[in-house]
């Protein structure tokens, strides 16, 4: 089920259970997961993209292995807030994934998440080679943490 906003996503989620954040690129999918109470996002892995069925199979294996209850996809908006071809591609991925899983799926604005991830890795004195290996999963962590913070805020205002 695709939830167009985090408020609807929050209503569709069970009270506890981990969720995943995804940073969809053309060559890779960065994956991060939360703890069961949805307080902290942790980078998990990178899926090398081939074709949708293989990508979805790898992702759904993570969903099953970790008993995830929802998915947050980074939505690459333009700096003016509009949606371009990359955002349309992300929405198409979500529609295709929706056919394969009953989990709620939502989007989170990913503007500057890769920049923030790169900055954090540089500050951590991570080598260029290592940065290239982990940047997508760290960016997924930033995307997921933003959504988790919003979910926590919504929980306080109910």
UniProtKB/Swiss-Prot annotation:
Biological process terms in GO annotation: rRNA 5'-end processing
Keywords: Cytoplasm, Hydrolase, Nuclease, Ribosome biogenesis
UniProt subcellular location: Cytoplasm
Top-level EC class as recorded in UniProt: hydrolase
Main location: cytoplasm
Family to which this protein belongs: Belongs to the YqgF nuclease family.
Name under which the protein is recorded: Putative pre-16S rRNA nuclease
One cellular component term from this protein's GO annotations in UniProt: cytosol
Keyword Cytoplasm set for record: yes
Function (record text): Could be a nuclease involved in processing of the 5'-end of pre-16S rRNA.
InterPro entries the record matches: RNaseH-like_sf (IPR012337), YqgF (IPR005227), YqgF/RNaseH-like_dom (IPR006641), YqgF/RNaseH-like_dom_sf (IPR037027)
GO terms assigned for molecular function: nuclease activity
Enzyme Commission number(s) of this protein: 3.1.-.-
Keyword Cytoplasm: yes
HAMAP family recorded: Nuclease_YqgF (MF_00651)
């Amino acid at each position: 089920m695709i939830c167009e906003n985090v408020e609807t996503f929050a209503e569709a989620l069970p009270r506890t259970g981990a969720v995943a954040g995804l940073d969809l690129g053309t060559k890779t999918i960065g994956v991060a997961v939360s703890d069961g109470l949805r307080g902290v996002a942790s980078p998990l892995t990178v899926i090398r993209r081939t074709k949708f069925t293989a990508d979805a199979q790898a992702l759904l294996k993570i969903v099953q292995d970790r008993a995830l209850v929802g998915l947050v996809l980074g939505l690459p908006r333009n700096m003016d807030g509009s949606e371009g071809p990359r955002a349309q591609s992300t929405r198409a991925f979500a529609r295709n994934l929706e056919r394969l899983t009953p989990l709620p799926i939502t989007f989170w604005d990913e503007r500057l998440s890769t920049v923030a991830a790169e900055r954090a890795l540089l500050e951590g004195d991570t080598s260029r080679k290592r940065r290239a290996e982990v940047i997508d999963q760290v960016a997924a962590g930033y995307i997921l943490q933003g959504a988790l913070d919003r979910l926590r805020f919504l929980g306080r205002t109910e």
